[in-house]
Amino acid sequence: MPELPDVVVYIEALTRHIVGQRLERLNLLSPFVLRSVDPPIDSINGQVVGGVRRVGKRIVLTFDADLFLVIHLMIAGRLRWREPKQKLGIGPKLILASFEFPTGTLFFTEASSKKRASIQLVRGEEALRGLDPGGVEPLDASLEQFHEALTRENHTLKRALTDPHLFSGIGNAYSDEILHAAKLSPLKLTRSLSDEEFLRLYDATRATLRIWIDLLRKDVKGGFPEKVTAFRGEMAVHGRFKQPCPVCGSPVQRIVYAENECNYCAKCQTSGRLLADRSLSRLLKDDWPKRLDD
C-alpha cells in the first residue's frame, strides 16, 4: 500500500502534470471503483484542477464549486501518467478509471481482484474531513502531540504507528523501517516506553519518512512515479526476511499475521529475542527458538 512518502511524491507529480489543467473527461472503467453517488461524478467534467492534497493515505483533487475528488489507492492501486499516443504498458483489465487532460491521460489502475481501490466525489470541507481518520501528521506533530497520540491506547508500537486514527499515512512498510531505526521492538507497548525510547521513536519517525521522501523524489527525477512498491532494496528490514541487517549483519526476522508481515532485527531491536510467529510457533511448539542464537 502506498504510504506517506509515496503519496507525497505522487502529489508532487500530479501538481506538475495536472494542476491548472481542465479535466476533459473522467471515464469509469470498473463498476466497483466509484463509492459515492452525490454529487454526480460527471459534474467535474470540464472543470479545472485547482490543487492536489493529501488526507492520510488518500489523494485529493480539488475543483471549483467546493468539489473534492478523493482517490484511495488501498493496497494495489496505482496512478500512471501517459502523454498522447504513449503506450500504457499494462493490461486494460487493470484500469479502474482514466482522467483525460489536454496534455495527457491519468490512469487509475489496480493489480488485484479484490477491488479495494476507490474514488469518491464529495462537496465541502466538512464532507472531506469526514473521510479523514484523524491521525496526527507525523512530520508536523510536536513532541507533545506525538506522545499524546502514541499513548492514547496501550497498544504495541507496530499497531499504534499503523493506526490511521493515531498517525496519518504510516503503514506496514515504513513502520518496520521506523522501528528498526529507533531500535525498538514492534511488540513493545506504547505506555512502557522510557523518555529516552520515546525520543528515539519520535526522531526516527521523522527522519525515516523524510529520508524516504527524498529517495523517492530522486527516483522520479521530476517525472511521474512508475515503480511504487512496498518492497525496496534500500530498506533495512521490511520485506528482507532472512537477509542480513545492514547495521549488525544478523538475519532479519518476521512475524506473519493476516495478510501482512512485520519485519525486524532481533539483535538491534529485541536484544536477541525472537518474537513468536503465530503459524510457525504453533507448528513447532516447544521447538520454537526463543533467541537468535538458539
Where are these regions (language model features)?
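Phosphate/anion-contacting hairpin/loop surfaces
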Residues: 63, 69-184, 189-192, 196, ...
